């Protein structure tokens, strides 16, 4: 079980208390955002604990991995350097799927700002493959950074492929809205030098309005709410 807890907080969910805490920390990795529930060290850790509680209650056999820890401990370093080595080939896969303006600024690498701690989506103006570094433009500053040890993270489609490569993933499930993304990530995994995993696409869960349940909107139902009205066995059906 892998938690994308190094993703930047893009928006404030509607069903979260103390929203001002999150509003002050937008674009920071979830593990760098204070917990609005004031129970854990970070919002990311709160979400991780909720996930592990669910898995434990339903007796899943799992190994938990945190994106933040995996990046910062250097467990992705080899794969990240390979992404840098194959930078041009990966962009050849991604860029045709983007609009013209986005193509001008896209890079697989998202630097972590050394001053604010935010995940930056900024133009990369030079790559240094032998040194394992990139130079990016942040406002009027040109900043050089290593790509390893948690100083950068990857855009999610490249991150997905890199993770498959690093962990030798051979089976992956995803919602049907991610089928096209899985195809792209499979191509990138093959560029990195490994066979992409077998995939299984499942149907989407919809709310009472027939709309997709969104984590950012918070328009779903929690496990605790479900179990107030139904048995654990009923949830196991899903």
For the regions a language model picked out, list residue spans one by one.
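N-terminal Rossmann-like or analogous alpha/beta NTP/dinucleotide-binding catalytic cores
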Residues: 1-91, 185
């Amino acid at each position: 079980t892998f938690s994308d807890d190094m993703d930047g907080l893009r928006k404030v969910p509607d069903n979260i208390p103390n929203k001002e805490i999150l509003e002050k920390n937008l674009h920071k990795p979830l593990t760098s955002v204070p917990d609005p529930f004031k129970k854990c060290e970070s919002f990311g850790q709160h979400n991780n604990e909720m996930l592990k509680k669910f898995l434990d209650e339903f007796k899943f056999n799992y190994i938990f991995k945190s994106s933040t820890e995996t990046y910062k401990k250097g467990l992705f370093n080899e794969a990240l350097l390979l992404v840098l080595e194959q930078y041009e080939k990966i962009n050849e896969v991604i860029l045709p799927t983007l609009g013209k303006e986005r193509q001008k600024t896209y890079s697989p690498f998202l630097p972590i700002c050394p001053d604010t701690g935010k995940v930056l989506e900024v133009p990369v103006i030079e790559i240094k493959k032998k040194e394992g570094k990139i130079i990016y433009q942040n406002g009027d500053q040109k900043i050089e950074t290593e790509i390893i040890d948690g100083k950068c993270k990857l855009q999610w489609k490249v991150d997905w492929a890199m993770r498959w490569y690093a962990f030798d993933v051979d089976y992956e499930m995803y919602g049907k809205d991610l089928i096209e993304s899985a195809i792209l990530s499979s191509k990138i995994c093959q560029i990195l030098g490994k066979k992409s995993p077998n995939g299984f696409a499942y149907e989407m869960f919809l709310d009472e309005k027939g709309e997709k349940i969104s984590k950012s909107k918070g328009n779903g139902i929690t496990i605790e709410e479900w179990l107030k009205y139904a048995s654990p066995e009923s949830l196991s059906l899903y």
